Amino acid sequence: METLCHRLNVCQEKILDCYELDSDKLVDQINYWTLLRYEAAMFYAARERNLRTINHQVVPATTVSKQKACQAIEMHMALQSLNKSDYNMEPWTMRETCYELWCVAPKQCFKKGGITVTVIFDGNKDNAMDYTSWKFIYIYDNDKWVKTNGNVDYTGIYYTVNSKKEYYVQFKDEAKIYGAQQWEVYMYGTVITCPEYVSSTCSDALSTTTTVEQLSNTPTTNPLTTCVGAKEAQTQQRKRQRLTEPDSSTISPLSVDNTNNQIHCGSGSTNTGGHQSATQTAFIVHLKGDTNCLKCFRYRFTKHKGLYKNVSSTWHWTSNTKTGIVTIVFDSAHQRETFIKTIKVPPSVTLSLGIMTL
């Protein structure tokens, strides 16, 4: 028992060291996933011996430990294979090699440089969806890794391998989901109409200025091509609008388009997580993720007590006992931005902004 406790302590300390190192070397990411394999294996072995806690940590259920072990093995093997390719000397951050990004479409491949693609259905700005195109996609094809570029056209979002387009988002299928007869695709505020429907769609297209200011969350310095989707042959009677999102933002490892591991918040941004009312309010951050990971992360950032006002213990909603939550309270929006820029958030932890009435 003492040996297991010691090994788990050493393993988790090294995992936290990987977070603080913030390396962009592939060998360091392989080491990180090796440690996660060891941690999951130790939790699994402890549960098999009917141990409920280790070092005051709750031992996950056998199925949970097994699932995490399988994920770690999958990522470890994929990264080891990538390390033997021509791309092993490229920068590889923890964010770019996390399991969540590995599972995002296109699945089971590595991706870099996310670009937001906004699709407006039926010309209604309230019935819009955001998708992600990738600047670089690394595909394992014919026993080797191939680097290709992501692209967008009026049909969907795709990449090209062996001169063949592989679509991982089809706008025609998405239009059926949202009850649309036609769609418009915007990227960086630029719109290009489908050649077959120039006359019927150009008059209804939104202006580029409106798109840049209201729809695009990405810089407009690199104009990329986008397009307007064609009308569907059959008119669907039912139309579903996406509800307008509240004035709060959620930052997660997968939603950041940068390729580094730092979360950026512009000082001039008006999205501060909500509007202050006449009552006393406080700016907050919710950290969501695995309970054990949150406890370790909370312990590490307590040495930066000047960057926040107060922090809660780990809690969870009664309907979801697997996901833990830590709430951090700030005196001002500026203090919150400083905290986000200073503290490195693990890729398995989701960061959400908001306000709370006191």
From Swiss-Prot:
**How does it get modified post-translation?**
Phosphorylated. Sumoylation plays a regulatory role in E2 transcriptional activity.
Extract the GO molecular function terms from the UniProt entry.
Answer: DNA binding; DNA-binding transcription factor activity; nucleotide binding
List the subcellular locations.
Host nucleus
Listed GO biological process terms: DNA replication; DNA-templated transcription; regulation of DNA replication; viral DNA genome replication
| Compositional bias (Polar residues) | 246-255
The UniProt annotation puts the region (Disordered) at 224-255
Organism's domain of life? Answer: Viruses
Q: What is its main location?
A: host cell
> Region Transactivation domain: what ranges?
1-199
Pfam families (UniProt xref): PPV_E2_C (PF00511), PPV_E2_N (PF00508)
Q: Which residues form the Glycyl lysine isopeptide (Lys-Gly) (interchain with G-Cter in SUMO) crosslink?
A: 288
Keyword entries, A-Z = Activator, DNA replication, DNA-binding, Early protein, Host nucleus, Isopeptide bond, Phosphoprotein, Repressor, Transcription, Transcription regulation, Ubl conjugation
One GO term describing the cellular component: host cell nucleus
InterPro entries associated with the record: E2/EBNA1_C_sf (IPR035975), Nucleotide-bd_a/b_plait_sf (IPR012677), Papillomavirus_E2_C (IPR000427), PPV_E2_N (IPR001866), Reg_prot_E2 (IPR033668), Regulatory_protein_E2_N (IPR036050), Regulatory_protein_E2_N_1 (IPR042503), Regulatory_protein_E2_N_2 (IPR042504)
Disulphide bond pairs: none
Region described as DNA-binding domain = 281-358
Q: How does it assemble?
A: Binds DNA as homodimer. Interacts with protein E1; this interaction greatly increases E1 DNA-binding activity. Interacts with protein L1; this interaction enhances E2-dependent replication and transcription activation. Interacts with protein L2; this interaction inhibits E2 transcriptional activity but not DNA replication function E2. Interacts with protein E7; this interaction inhibits E7 oncogenic activity. Interacts with host TAF1; this interaction modulates E2-dependent transcriptional regulation. Interacts with host BRD4; this interaction mediates E2 transcriptional activation function.
- Role of this protein: Plays a role in the initiation of viral DNA replication. A dimer of E2 interacts with a dimer of E1 in order to improve specificity of E1 DNA binding activity. Once the complex recognizes and binds DNA at specific sites, the E2 dimer is removed from DNA. E2 also regulates viral transcription through binding to the E2RE response element (5'-ACCNNNNNNGGT-3') present in multiple copies in the regulatory regions of the viral genome. Activates or represses transcription depending on E2RE's position with regards to proximal promoter elements including the TATA-box.
Family designation: Belongs to the papillomaviridae E2 protein family.
Record's protein name: Regulatory protein E2
Annotated organism of origin: Human papillomavirus 51
